[in-house]
Amino acid sequence: MSEVTKELLELVWGTKSSPGLSDTIFCRWTQGFVFSESEGSALEQFEGGPCAVIAPVQAFLLKKLLFSSEKSSWRDCSEEEQKELLCHTLCDIVESAYDSSGSYCLVSWLRGRTPEEAARISGSPAQSSCQVEHSSALAVEELGFERFHALIQKRSFRTVSELKDAVLDQYSMWGNKFGVLLFLYSVLLTKGIENIKNSIEDANEPLIDPVYGHGSQSLINLLLTGHAVSNVWDGDRECSGMQLLGIHEQAAVGFLTLMEALRYCKVGSYLKSPKFPIWIVGSETHLTVFFAKDMALVAPEAPSEQARRVFQTYDPEDNGFIADSLLEDVMKALDLVSDPEYINLMKNKLDPEGLGIILLGPFLQEFFPDQGSSGPESFTVYHYNGLKQSNYNEKVMYVEGTAVVMGFEDPMLQTDDTPIKRCLQTKWPYIELLWTTDRCPSLN
């Protein structure tokens, strides 16, 4: 794999200026796709960091399981069903990253070796003989950063059919200690290193943070949409003559982030309103998955929801109001009557105290009365967190709950203010959540 190793490693890990630190981060990423013993379709995450790959894979696996499978008991998965689900999901993500000028790529062990064999042949004779005496798991454990990358190869395929056969054939590899990294490299090489560099705002910023080990937004977006752009808004923007790339079409799986609730960013509708009711949920340090089985949640937006979205484009700081001078622009954007006399009449009605601002709530009630959300008012939801220590009784299982979406008025029911609720309120401002467990699901 020498022809791409240096470029690939710099793209993922950056310049390795501190070998000890990089090895520490690398070790946190060395795990396979392993299913929970307590939840047949849930993947486990052992250390902080690889959620940037595991959570998107989990989300697309749920999409396949809930909306393409004929299983009645979706939470019960046999080993054969797990194999089919995982391989189908990995293929879908690689396929979404495919660039028509390249080929489908898989990164695997050199000459088809198992990780145990690779570990035994890769070191000095003393090391190898020592490893032979230990379990195969320990042998894999001994593979460090340099040795691992010397023992992998790139394989190219011309058709999706060939790719699928190879992914199925290598099923055991995806579950071994390096499965997540081998899959990540497969996606990156399928997309093309230059294509990725051209999408990232700062090409010198690695996809995996060299200090904390977290995946970048570009990496998350690549796995979700097939494009490694650095931003989560709709379309491209220009700032000081520099083009900032965003999301260009509705995603199959969505993305919500606590960072929006904290006003660090604004997620666009292409990620916030995906094709399927499954969302990656980001905290400051971790990624989890929020999902439902009700497709009504992703029905086309109602006029009131469109109005809310348009209003908020004129309220970039999410204050809940706009200057009254912007009312005409908002009404024109929504194809409402916008002649000057009517605009002045509405200004006086919506701002009777003459404060010079128009509040979102009264605006929606004036022009879109009795129009709630186009989705259901109450629906069953689930939350997934791959870290054992973040789950009840340290068992990776889906947490079930009921979501209630209120109207514009002050909700009569108010549950606790929690990180997951604050995050979901960026999508459903008046959502309330009731979980079946004693404690609220953790985003970390």
From Swiss-Prot:
InterPro entries: EF-hand-dom_pair, MINDY-3/4_CD, MINY3/4. GO terms for molecular function: cysteine-type deubiquitinase activity; K48-linked deubiquitinase activity. This is Ubiquitin carboxyl-terminal hydrolase MINDY-3. It comes from the Eukaryota. Its main location: nucleus. PANTHER family: UBIQUITIN CARBOXYL-TERMINAL HYDROLASE MINDY-3 (PTHR12473:SF17), UBIQUITIN CARBOXYL-TERMINAL HYDROLASE MINDY-4-RELATED (PTHR12473). Hydrolase that can remove 'Lys-48'-linked conjugated ubiquitin from proteins. It comes from Mus musculus.
